[in-house]
Amino acid sequence: MVGFGLIIGFLKLINSVHTLFKPYINTDLLNSLTNVNLTTYIPNFLMLFYMEVLVNAFMVLMSAYLIYLYFTKSKKFPKYYIFITLFVLLAIPMDAYIASTIIPTAEVIDKDMVKSVFQSLFSGAIWIPYMLKSLRVRNTFIED
């Protein structure tokens, strides 16, 4: 169940990263939002954009690493899984807050954001205790 969730989560993450950044690739959109001389300029948008790139790159790399740890039955898997789950729980509202301070007119707390937070909370409430307490987890993830 965990392995299936990791793979589906990774594919969903790749899709959402592609959807998020596609409008900025090979277009003048980023320039129009970061050029001080244009009326579409948004102060600090470039910083927000780079932060989004870094966080999303981190998430993609960590998700791929988690899949590797899972299939190699590494002892590190439960700890990294818990770390990433907690990171996502903190990153979603933090990202929304930072975006709302940079773009005050943007509606950052929307249906999708609330859904993501509740999905992460629900997933964390189930899988974090399982990773910490399960004898099966301790017996499966034994490789160094």
Positions of the model-derived regions?
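Topology signature of small-to-medium multi-pass alpha-helical membrane proteins
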Residues: 2-144
